[in-house]
Amino acid sequence: MAAEEYRWMGKPLKIGELEAEVPIIQGGMGVGISRSSLAGAVAKEGGVGIISTAQIGYDEDGFEEDQAGCNRLAIRRHLARAKEIACGNGLIGVNIMVALKHYKEHVKEAVAAGADVIISGAGLPMNLPELVGETCRTKIAPIVSSKRATQLILKMWDHHYKRTADFIVIEGPKAGGHLGFSDEQLKDVGAIDFDGEVQQIIACKRAYEEKFEREIPVIVAGGIYDGTDIRHALELGADGVQIASRFVATKECDASEAYKQAYIQAKDEDIEIIKSPVGMPGRALRNAFLERIKGSKQSILKCYNCLEKCNPAKVPYCITKALIDAVKGDVKNGLVFCGANTGRIHEMTTVHQLMQELIAETAV
């Protein structure tokens, strides 16, 4: 007898004229963790699949000699493949880090390749509207962590480009990867009133909704694990959620099997806050690599020119090499970013099973 199939019975996620039946965005994870396989599978289930463009072409022929060219090629290739996998369902987009040296090129490539949405963080995407152009159908969203950052970006876009965000991703302190909080704040995550911040941001964006006569959906991210978390976010007034870490332990995730197993085997005490060459704190799994960089600066034999502001002579390690080593399977000597709830992940699943589980739990 076939298992019961669950359908999302709540409101869909509407971003302008675009619509995703299930208001779940799969967060972008780089290097190489969320590419076409994962993003396409999430969209196929009615959600929003997000491809990370950070060194996306790491496994393309000629990458060592021409990273920029291989990354542009891979953006096109993976967006096209994700759309094929999705079979017309959901939405497909990209996550592009502001800190990237070739940020502008990645944005333009994603637009040309037909990305439905661009989500941009690791810095505030001040000039994103200019890069996508006025007539572009691709929807854009900044990642923010505070009311202050939200006010700044919305005011900037309004003043300089006479437009506003198509949606906003609010990322909390329990997220993985790079975090928009200080080291001091991250020492006591419980002291941060994130719910209050979300409500303030929702109130803040209403003036821009009125001015531009359009809705600006709000997506809550960071530590979203199950249906209880999704329900809570929606009750706060959010229009959807972004989930990343839970999708790592799926068969469709683009990472190596060793990377997925590192998540499954992780315990709460294995997770720590680190300093990234990007200039922001990050959350990652403790391993031999992190222990080494605490003691001394790692020699950088090759610069990949991946970050806009990076001095190889001063940074403690090469983030590109560390992330590529990890995604390929060397999880002891690479950098494994993760969310605060990774210790709750204990088994492998599929995107379909996970989405079904989340939908069923949210409906309870």
Residues covered by each model-derived region:
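Conserved active-site-proximal phosphate/metal-binding subdomains
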Residues: 25, 175-219, 225-364
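Active-site entrance/lid segments in N-terminal catalytic domains of soluble metabolic enzymes
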Residues: 2-208
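Residue-level detector of alpha-helix initiation sites
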Residues: 33, 224-225
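Residue-level detector of intrinsically disordered, flexible termini
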Residues: 1-2, 325
